[in-house]
Amino acid sequence: IVADVDPDSPDFEYWSSTQEGMFSCNGTGLVSTTYPTGIGSGVMYNVAIYWSGQSTREMLDRGCIVSYKANPDVNKSNKNRLISFDLYGSNQGNHASKYNPCYYGDFLGDYREEVILGSSDYKSIYIFSTNHPTTHRLPHLMTDHNYDMSQAMQNMGYNQGTNLGYYVGAETLKSS
């Protein structure tokens, strides 16, 4: 996965299921063994999501959203997990191996992305939207052609994360 998840490292970071550690966009090793992790301490390498109202992205995988670095302003318990969907009755992703949601993206238009998941009995859908306040403002992400096309690809073909046609990261987004 490639995303800006670390506010202390400029630009994108990347990691995978086969490499040791996390790297900066120019290949410099940032950490040798600390991966972004989620439920069961599994490595989070499914998709990145704008959720907490910060300028960096969080990771969406295995039925939860986690932040790489805990932000006490966002999560008072100072833990990385921001939400676990199964606590709200939703534990059905589209794939057992990747636990992709039915849909995720900025469909409410405030740049933070929403998540749609099914109920365990397949009779209901759950739409999750963040409750974290933000002072950041961006245009509706669906107005970006690359983002719009990545949304279409996510739901028609092989599930991959969304990508913008421009860079948004910790050092570029200012509070309004």
Give a label for each model feature.
Residues 1-176:
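Beta-propeller-forming repeat regions
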